[in-house]
Amino acid sequence: MGSAIFPPGSVIFLPGDYRRGVIVSIPVTTRVGVVAHKGILADCLGPDKFPTVIHNAKAYGDQVVETTMTDYCRFGLGPVRSEGYPGQLPPEAVLERARSALTRPWKLTHNCEHFVGWAHDVPATSPQLRQRLTKAALVSAAGAGLFAAGVVVFRRRSHR
C-alpha cells in the first residue's frame, strides 16, 4: 500500500518513547477505512536493525505474530507512533505475555487493540471497533428511519 510520502515498508518514527514493551501504532487501510494498527515493541533486533514488533494481524495469517519493523510497516500509510506504556507490568512480563499468544487467532473481538491491552494486563478494549460499530448502528438506524418514512409517505399517497 503505502503512499507517495511513505512508500511501502518505509520505517519512519515520530518522536516518542520507543523502549521495549511500548505500544506502537501505524495507520493502515482496511475494508472499513484507515485504522491504527497496534503492536508491542519487542526486545530483539530484526535483520533490518530495528526492534521486532509483536502484533495481532489479519494480514499475517489472522494471528498474533512477531515480525520485523519493516514487515510491520509494509501496509502502513504513515510513520510509526509510540502509544505509550499503559500498565504497571515490567517490560519482561509484557513481552512474555505477548509471546505466549503467538499464533493465537485474530478475531474481531480479539483484535490488535485487545491484544496490546491484554499483554499489558490492562482492560482489553478497542475504541476503534466501538467507534466503527457505533457509526454502523447510526447509519443503519438512519436508513431504517428513512425507509420507514418513505413507506409511510408512499402509503399516504396511495390512499388519496
State where each predicted segment sits.
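Glycine-rich catalytic cores of cysteine/serine-nucleophile enzymes that process amide/ester linkages
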Residues: P7-G84
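Short helix-to-loop capping/linker segments positioned immediately adjacent to catalytic or ligand/cofactor-binding
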Residues: V28-T30, L102-K107, A149
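Aromatic/basic micro-patches that form nucleic-acid/chromatin recognition or nuclease catalytic surfaces
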Residues: G76-T103
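Active-site nucleophilic cysteine motif
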Residues: W106-P123
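Short hydrophobic alpha-helical membrane-entry/anchor segments
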Residues: R132-A136, L146-R160
